[in-house]
């Protein structure tokens, strides 16, 4: 009698691999929480920021499926980092729906920082959900006929076979911030900066921009009260907006939106290029990580975010970022 051990092992591996991948991507990695540590090397004129610790979180997309245990994990981790300042770069909710106002409020109230908590809005945070429609144009997406599969296929086709351009549908008009979300934020430690800037004790400017997809991105208005003698931290949900800020001041831009993207292949290089294109960004090379723009003397950090419409993650775990400000004479 012959026992084909090798064949049996191979068959088992073939069956087990996709099952284990599915379990990992749906149930394990979405609940991991990775910390990214960055250093901002300060020029002499900004030496007064030495030692400042800024924590960024982004893209929570809180909905009924967001586990309470995961929210507590985020809160504990942020607290353990002892941030001087906390920034949230948009997409508090999912598809313009506040599904659990108490859960969101309690989570946000569990976060704090002595210099303040600041936020901008993302494309999910307006009165109507804004994304790419079935033609690849930026448009409002009705809940009753969102056609997610067709929109996804259009997005994939555009990403792989043509360039994704930030083109608005002809009928699209600027969207107002979600009123329910605004009422929640009003009762939390977070100060929403919607095309606004604040100056903290003659130390630093904080600028928050409206979302680009919502047609609320207005840097001219946002920088009106900017103090050019001080450093500036800019919150802008969509990293594509970095190129619209060339004529404006500011030293560090925090963004999110792309989620990494949520399914990412770090190798081989061509696979990473393809998955980055699936982020839907006009500039897919900005899908995640730290970028330097020497001409503007500016840094951009694109956060992978914490959640998503679907809690699926593969080689792109949820992220908290901490940036230390360091001056070395």
From Swiss-Prot:
Q: Where is it mostly found?
A: membrane
User: Which of UniProt's keywords are assigned here?
Assistant: Cell inner membrane, Cell membrane, Hydrolase, Manganese, Membrane, Metal-binding, Transmembrane, Transmembrane helix
UniProt GO BP? lipid A biosynthetic process
Pathway, per record? Glycolipid biosynthesis; lipid IV(A) biosynthesis
**UniProt-annotated location(s):** Cell inner membrane
Q: Where does a divalent metal cation 1 bind?
A: 59, 61, 91, 259
| Cystine crosslinks | none
The EC code for this enzyme is: 3.6.1.-
Q: How is the cofactor bound?
A: Binds 2 divalent metal cations.
- Root EC class: hydrolase
Tell me yes or no: is Membrane among this UniProt entry's keywords.
Answer: yes
Q: Which residues bind a divalent metal cation 2?
A: 91, 123, 257
Q: Which domain of life is it from?
A: Bacteria
Pfam families, per the entry:
Metallophos
The coenzyme or cofactor needed here is:
Mn(2+)
Q: Which family does it belong to?
A: Belongs to the metallophosphoesterase superfamily.
* Name of the protein in its database record: UDP-2,3-diacylglucosamine pyrophosphatase LpxG
**What is the species listed in this Swiss-Prot or TrEMBL entry?**
Chlamydia muridarum (strain MoPn / Nigg)
